[in-house]
């Protein structure tokens, strides 16, 4: 993949990697989804994929948060709360 030059192409690159990796998760829990998103995007940052584009750490934090919520919705992950007795 070419190195992205715009914030939009950087976000698309993150989305593509996270979505592809999410398909191979053995289970879809809040923790596994959070860990996956952090691991994939942090490794892209460390590998210098975004050094040519004007994306900020704040932008990346927002992207991570949105991806986590969207994946939880896609995979119907529920936060486990204690059962309420009726």
Which residue stretches match the model-derived regions?
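Terminal helices and disordered tails flanking the catalytic cores of nucleotide-processing hydrolases
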Residues: 1-86
